[in-house]
């Protein structure tokens, strides 16, 4: 990868993160005041503070310490349920210490996708009956990123609403709807839980790949945080849980015939492009057959177009009407067959692991340059870039750079 490529990706990440930062009149800290809020996109498509988007952009290391501390504080003070289960309308529940999907400017937490309502009516179950799994784990990853870049270990003992940050993180890590024997996240078919936010219009059941990978990464991060404050025994326990999850991910989701990982064991038992790439990026799997599957799909044009990544290989759609077995959106739109740059960095790392090539990143940069005046990088595009959405999208700008950083850190040609 040429130095100009790495530099261009960094510049794009900086610019996109800047485009996503808006000054809003908000009440996150007990009073209404003007404060900078990081939104998912530069066109304000989503008018709230999304926990996962912020955490994923933060992985770039490009958010200033003071800003990341503020966002972390917003989640700790406004975005986590208390000790009791909240029972909402239409059979929805918010488990103890669940973390919100997004937090409105008035400081009120919204635990379910598809709505800005923060009261008892947060949906009818079409976005799950428990909050998406992912935000508990992104809360932990956000905290770990802040401590890593700032060196501010003391924040872990700081009080946030009557609990230390460490206590809040540990309760988030325990999670809900977990198969305790395997450590994997599990969704009931009759009252399902959204896997994670970038497939919140997709219904899955059984054990879930992507949520379990996030749980693995969060436990590994929490182990390091425990070590940083001298809690080595507790750190070893969290690391052991991470190892258990990784072992069971490989046992449960890996398809030896193809090298792909399945997205779920029930509804949605399909090859998961994003999840497979993320498993490689997370160090959970490194099988040659898996790397070959990702390379073959890239070279064959079934998983990637212009550096953007599809959730399901295009030649593995569930039917002629839908990429996923169960989705609320039309084929080849949004999360049901469109192409996204959120997974580009993970995929780039996997391709580099296979044959030391990084063409996917240069493809992405070329497309971004061609459509920059139209709002690139986009949230998603179709194959022809005729249908698209989400302008100057935060994770589309930041995560390709994160993949490039990983390649460089492991000795990739820069």
Which residue ranges define each predicted feature?
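An active-site-proximal structural segment forming one wall of the substrate-binding cleft
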Residues: 165-176
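Extended glycan-interaction surfaces of carbohydrate-active proteins
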Residues: 2-49, 71-124, 130, 175-206, ...
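Solenoid-repeat scaffolds in large eukaryotic assemblies
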Residues: 68-71, 235, 242, 290, ...
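The substrate-binding groove and active-site-proximal loops of carbohydrate-active enzymes
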Residues: 52, 122-130, 153-163
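Well-ordered alpha-helical scaffold segments within catalytic/enzyme domains
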Residues: 55-67, 138-157, 214-231, 277-289, ...
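Structural signature of alpha-solenoid helical repeat junctions
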Residues: 131, 135-138, 142, 211-214, ...
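Active-site neighborhood of glycoside hydrolase catalytic domains
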Residues: 209-252
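C-terminal substrate/ligand-recognition segments
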Residues: 329-357
């Amino acid at each position: 990868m040429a130095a100009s490529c790495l530099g261009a990706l960094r510049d794009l990440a900086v610019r996109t993160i800047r485009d996503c930062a808006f000054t809003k009149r908000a009440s996150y800290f007990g009073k209404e005041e003007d404060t900078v809020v990081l939104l998912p996109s530069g066109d304000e498509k989503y008018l709230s503070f999304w926990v996962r988007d912020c955490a994923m952009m933060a992985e770039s290391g490009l958010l200033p310490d003071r800003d990341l501390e503020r966002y972390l504080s917003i989640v700790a003070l406004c975005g986590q349920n208390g000790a009791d289960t909240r029972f909402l309308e239409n059979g929805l529940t918010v488990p103890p210490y669940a973390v919100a999907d997004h937090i409105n400017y008035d400081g009120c937490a919204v635990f379910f996708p598809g709505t800005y309502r923060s009261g008892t009516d947060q949906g009818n179950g079409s976005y799950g009956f428990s909050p998406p799994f992912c935000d508990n784990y992104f809360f932990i990853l956000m905290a770990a990123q802040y401590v890593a870049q700032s060196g501010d270990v003391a924040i872990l003992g700081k009080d946030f609403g009557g609990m230390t940050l460490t206590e809040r993180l540990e309760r988030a890590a325990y999670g809900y709807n977990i198969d305790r024997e395997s450590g994997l996240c599990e969704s009931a078919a009759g009252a399902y839980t959204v896997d994670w936010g970038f497939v919140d219009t997709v219904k899955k059941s059984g054990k879930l790949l992507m949520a379990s990978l996030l749980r693995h990464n969060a436990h590994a991060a929490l182990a390091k945080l425990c070590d940083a404050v001298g809690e080595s025994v507790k750190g070893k326990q969290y690391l052991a849980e991470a190892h258990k999850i990784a072992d069971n991910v490989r046992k449960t989701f890996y398809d030896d015939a193809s090298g792909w990982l399945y997205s779920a064991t029930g509804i949605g038992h399909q090859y998961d492009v994003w999840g497979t790439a993320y498993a490689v990026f997370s160090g959970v799997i490194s099988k040659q057959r898996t790397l070959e599957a990702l390379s073959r799909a890239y070279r064959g044009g079934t998983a990637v177009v212009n550096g953007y990544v599809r959730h399901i290989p295009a030649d593995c759609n569930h039917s002629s009407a839908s990429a996923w077995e169960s989705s609320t959106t039309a084929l080849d739109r949004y999360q049901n067959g469109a192409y996204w740059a959120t997974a580009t960095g993970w995929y780039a790392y996997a391709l580099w692991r296979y044959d030391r090539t990084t063409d996917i990143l240069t493809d992405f940069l070329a497309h971004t340059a061609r459509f920059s005046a139209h709002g690139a990088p986009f949230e998603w595009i179709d194959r022809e870039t005729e249908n698209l959405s989400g302008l100057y999208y935060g994770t589309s700008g930041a995560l390709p750079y994160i993949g490039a950083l990983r390649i460089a850190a492991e000795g990739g040609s820069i």
